[in-house]
Design a protein with these regions (language model features):
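Short gly/ser/thr-rich secondary-structure transition/capping motifs
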Residues: 124-129
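Non-transmembrane functional regions of envelope-associated proteins
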Residues: 1-100, 138-170
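Short amphipathic alpha-helices and their capping/turn segments at secondary-structure boundaries
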Residues: 130-139
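Active-site Gly/Thr loop motif
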Residues: 103-123
């Protein structure tokens, strides 16, 4: 039974009325899930044109709330246990984990502010494994590990007219 690592607190209503619900979930290896500080969803919302412009910060599966990967990284990096949601009559107004406050749409969705992809931000897994990198490369940074091979089907279109690895969206 998968359980979110974040604790959700809300003021002004029940966020489950407004968050996107998914019918099923595919988790990581149980051993990994049990030994990490955070678990985040990596789901995208379907778009008619296939371009990813927005991302939910909180999703729902099996009547339980889960943060998306980006929000969970912020929470864990800030050494917080809680995610707070402020709601009004129309839905979610703000999502926060101290000291960060993020305004969202009523469904907890934010618009992604893309920037031009910078290859210098990448390092191959092979180089890490072989120790062929500057140790300072990872210092004081959030690190995402992902695959970018076309056959893995984790490439997404952005409003900038480019296709990027899905991990870069987070």
């Amino acid at each position: 039974d998968r359980k979110a690592k974040a604790r959700f607190l809300s003021k002004g209503g029940d966020p489950k009325q407004f968050t996107y619900q998914y019918p099923y979930s595919i988790g990581s290896l149980e051993k990994l899930e049990q030994n990490v500080q955070g678990l985040g969803s990596i789901s995208f919302l379907d778009q008619l044109d296939g371009i990813i412009r927005s991302l939910p910060l909180i999703v729902q599966f099996d009547k339980k709330l889960y943060p998306t990967m980006g929000l969970e990284m912020v929470r864990v990096g800030a050494k917080q246990k809680n995610v707070y949601m402020e709601l009004n009559d129309v839905g979610i107004k703000r999502i926060s984990t101290r000291p960060y406050k993020i305004n969202s749409d009523p469904n907890g969705i934010i618009w992604i502010k893309y920037k031009k992809s910078q290859k210098k931000q990448y390092i191959s897994a092979g180089d890490v494994y072989d120790g062929n990198f500057e140790k300072s490369f990872f210092e004081n940074k959030y690190v995402l590990i992902g695959a970018s091979a076309q056959g893995l089907f984790d490439l997404v279109k952005t409003p900038l007219g480019v296709t990027i690895p899905g991990v870069e969206v987070h």
